Amino acid sequence: MKNYVIAIVAISTVFFSSCKASKETKSTANIYDTTWELEYISGPRIAFDGLFPNKKPQLTFDQKETRVYGNNGCNGYSASYTLDGKKLSFGEAGPTTMMFCDGGGEQQFLQQINKITSYTIDKEGKLSLNEGDVPMMRFKKVAK
């Protein structure tokens, strides 16, 4: 009888561990092959549309090159990133086309993205970039 209990506990442990691992892998995979458009940024007391009057920042994660590409609401944006489970950090941004940007959103975007330490994807499929547990930026998937 004791052997049956031990066997059931061992099988249950393996089963639940594998379910958790596959859920995390699927969630990590969701960050790739998608263009993400910013819909919220913390910090400024200016309306979101006022920060980004011409276009919203977008990001695309390249898994093979471990780089993120897109725009910061005005100029191009490109940087390396490090992803380990739910931990996420961005490297120094590469050079961009220097245009004058209305609204001040470009600087806010660059300041916030350098503070990011983790990410989550919620039930609605929205990507939150967090500083600790605090969401600093939220992105929605762009329809292709």
Region roles according to the model:
Residues A7-F15:
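Bacterial N-terminal signal peptides
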Residues Y4, S17-K144:
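Lipid interaction determinants
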